[in-house]
């Protein structure tokens, strides 16, 4: 049986894991799984359908039949490109509220594991190393101070032409962190054996280089 390499990069919102994962995947020629986008897609689809964030059964059914396609920096839901829409703060907050439900997470598990294909996979999220790919040869837990993360998220949104208030972002991040850490379903924590990387004072290039160095060492 062929073993497909997986690098998991977990961490809190706006820790830089998505950017680092994308660049690591590019450097290695690996596939990329943005698991957070899946929850955002469920959030968007359920919002459009008028489904409440506590309607767990309906949310889980929507997650199980999610019609999603990923491309370089792009994502489609039922044939409609929603790359920018799912990055709205309101959708992110809704996704965070939906992600606490175990049936929703279970519905997305098989879909996420299906991304594990040759030549390899870089998977970013919150439970990639703890739940989805616990056998990954390299697990990274990326973090940064909440202030650094708020500044990054503010810049990301402004660069995309989306209005933002840094005080509101800071408060939202603190609320999401608390929700992610304390939820019963797959709480945010470093996986066993994970390498921890604080990117508060690091450039993206430095973080990517460190992950690639670790991967070379564990292969």
UniProtKB/Swiss-Prot annotation:
Cytoplasm is among the record's keywords: yes
InterPro entries documented for this protein: Cytidylate_kin (IPR003136), Cytidylate_kinase_dom (IPR011994), P-loop_NTPase (IPR027417)
Superkingdom assignment: Bacteria
One GO cellular component term noted in the UniProt record for this chain: cytosol
Location(s) in or outside the cell: Cytoplasm
Catalytic class of the enzyme: transferase
Reaction it catalyzes: CMP + ATP = CDP + ADP; dCMP + ATP = dCDP + ADP
GO biological process, one term: nucleobase-containing small molecule interconversion
E.C. number(s) listed in UniProt: 2.7.4.25
Protein name according to UniProt: Cytidylate kinase
SUPFAM superfamilies named in the record: P-loop containing nucleoside triphosphate hydrolases
Annotated ATP binding sites: 11-19
Taxonomic source organism: Cupriavidus metallidurans (strain ATCC 43123 / DSM 2839 / NBRC 102507 / CH34)
One Pfam family linked to the record: Cytidylate_kin
Entry-linked NCBIfam families: cmk
Similarity comment text for this entry: Belongs to the cytidylate kinase family. Type 1 subfamily.
GO molecular function, one term: dCMP kinase activity
The entry's keywords: ATP-binding, Cytoplasm, Kinase, Nucleotide-binding, Transferase
Gene: cmk
């Amino acid at each position: 049986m062929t073993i497909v390499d997986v690098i998991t990069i977990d961490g809190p919102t706006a820790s830089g894991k998505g950017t680092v994962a994308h660049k690591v995947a590019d450097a290695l020629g690996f596939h990329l799984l943005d698991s957070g986008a899946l929850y955002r897609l469920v959030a968007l689809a359920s919002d459009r359908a008028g489904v409440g964030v506590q309607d767990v059964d309906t949310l889980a059914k929507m997650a199980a039949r999610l019609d999603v396609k990923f491309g370089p920096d792009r994502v489609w839901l039922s044939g409609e490109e929603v790359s920018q829409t799912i990055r709205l703060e309101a959708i992110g907050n809704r996704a965070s509220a939906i992600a606490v439900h175990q049936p929703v997470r279970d519905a997305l598990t098989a879909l996420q594991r299906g991304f594990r294909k040759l030549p390899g996979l870089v998977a970013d999220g919150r439970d990639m190393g703890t739940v989805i790919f616990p056998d990954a040869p390299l697990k990274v837990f990326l973090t940064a101070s909440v202030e650094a993360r708020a500044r990054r998220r503010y810049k990301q949104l402004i660069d995309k032409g989306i209005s933002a208030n840094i005080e509101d972002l800071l408060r939202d991040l603190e609320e999401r962190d608390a929700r992610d850490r304390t939820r019963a379903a797959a709480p945010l924590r470093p996986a066993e054996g994970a390498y921890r990387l604080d990117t508060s004072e690091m450039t993206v290039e430095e973080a990517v280089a460190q992950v690639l160095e670790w991967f070379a060492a564990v292969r």
